Amino acid sequence: MRKSKVLTLGFQHVLAMYAGAVIVPLIVGSSLKLNAEQLAYLVSIDLLTCGIATLLQVWRNKFFGIGLPVMLGCTFTAVGPMIAIGSEYGMPAIYGSVLASGLFLALFAGFFGKLARFFPPIVTGSVVTIIGITLIPVAVQDMGGGQGSADFGSLSNLALSFGVLLFIILANRFFTGFIRAISILLGLIFGTIAGAFMGKVDIGPLLDASWFHGIHPFYFGFPTFHLPSILTMTLVAIVSVMESTGVFVALGKITEKELTADDLKRGYRSEGLASILGSIMNSFPYTTYSQNVGLIQISKVKSRDVVITAGFILVILGFMPKIAALTLLIPTAVLGGAMIAMFGMVVSSGIKMLGAIDLNNHENLLIIACSVSVGLGVTVAPNLFDHLPDSIKILTSNGIVAGSLTAILMNFLFTVGRKKQDESHASAENVHAA
């Protein structure tokens, strides 16, 4: 394949995942009130780490790397938990929890086959649904212009946000292939241009940003560790691994490569290493991006060279704050419109997982009902368990942790019950037959 074609296809992969890669640091940074300089650094270092994480996964060796043409980017599943952790304990606590969850993935990658039975679709589907629903209020606030903004809910903000949402919907309705894959990115560009004509774009951060910068490990301070935060991010890591497994299997079929348990172990370990790197570099947990799988199907090009090129492009972009500062031009309302579509898709992903189970089974419905309700309840009323001992509050202070544990425990309870009933029923049948 010609080098020019490899470079072009590499840029396509970068464009397909670019919106997802930059929107996570933008949302988290904006929610935690970072200034323009900090936001620009957060976005640029995230692009850099996305590139390195991708290269770690594509580079197959004895210890890590699945060796498939897969792109890694920030996981949306972690957005809500990171905002909650940052609001409660500060940015260093985010990186402490990301570091701990990354170590967990890297060290116990070989045991995920055994852990998977505790995280069937009814558990992972409930967790992803809870995470998606708890993110929606963040998107709605931004649609209005951002919490506390003087023009919150103004007609101009609503026109921008709903205009972007409509653009994304129409792009998915009337286009397929690559255009559909970058519909979010196109929506952000469209909304920013419209916002500029409405006087809602400030080019100051772009002008102030330098063209190149160095890397500053622990830019936001040395990681701090808090058990509730670590538990939350570890659950997020497990859910992300379950999602990645589906992407790995899909890519294995596309590339006609039969995956072994050892392949999956190296893939999981790479995600753990990427998260460890993310915590050191002031970035986020990483997971495989399914939109790039669709791009491989569209282009019919299965070469790892294309994805390796995309990884190096991201690394180069990560050293250029001026490129990252372009994302700071996006008006908050525009971001909110895109977030509605993106976070809604997180909810849809959770519902899709739940679609794999028997919804005619009353016990399954009860598990979903209780876990989602507990998760949302704790999110809405976080002080509900303030009078409980600290050792218990660790497990109940976060809606995602509380809802996830509810799903895990209820699934275990009903699964054990069903096995015992089945064994008793089988014994009774044997006695009757005798």
Curated annotation (Swiss-Prot):
It comes from the Bacteria. The chain crosses the membrane at residues 9-29, 39-59, 63-83, 93-113, 118-138, 159-179, 181-201, 218-238, 306-326, 327-347, 365-385, 394-414. This is Nucleobase transporter PlUacP. Keywords: Cell membrane, Membrane, Transmembrane, Transmembrane helix, Transport. Inhibited by the proton gradient disruptor carbonyl cyanide m-chlorophenylhydrazone (CCCP), but not by the sodium gradient disruptor ouabain. Hypoxanthine, xanthine, cytosine and uric acid act as competitive inhibitors. InterPro entries: NCS2, UacT-like, Xan_ur_permease. The keyword Transmembrane applies. GO terms for cellular component: plasma membrane.
